[in-house]
């Protein structure tokens, strides 16, 4: 019986960087979006 884990050892684990161009683009859009949604939601509770 052969060892079934030996072919799996040839796969190397790739570590990706956290801060990429995609990360910057997503957060450049997501952070102001969440801020404005929170501001609009807060405006709903303002009574004159």
From Swiss-Prot:
Membrane topology: Single-pass membrane protein
Keywords: Electron transport, Heme, Iron, Membrane, Metal-binding, Photosynthesis, Photosystem II, Thylakoid, Transmembrane, Transmembrane helix, Transport
Binding-site positions, heme: 27
GO MF annotation terms: electron transfer activity; heme binding; iron ion binding
Spans through the membrane: 23-39
Cellular compartment(s): Cellular thylakoid membrane
Cofactor-binding details, from the entry: With its partner (PsbE) binds heme. PSII binds additional chlorophylls, carotenoids and specific lipids.
Known cofactor(s): heme b
CC terms in the record's Gene Ontology section: photosystem II reaction center; plasma membrane-derived thylakoid membrane
UniProt record similarity statement: Belongs to the PsbE/PsbF family.
Quaternary assembly: Heterodimer of an alpha subunit and a beta subunit. PSII is composed of 1 copy each of membrane proteins PsbA, PsbB, PsbC, PsbD, PsbE, PsbF, PsbH, PsbI, PsbJ, PsbK, PsbL, PsbM, PsbT, PsbX, PsbY, Psb30/Ycf12, peripheral proteins PsbO, CyanoQ (PsbQ), PsbU, PsbV and a large number of cofactors. It forms dimeric complexes.
Protein name: Cytochrome b559 subunit beta
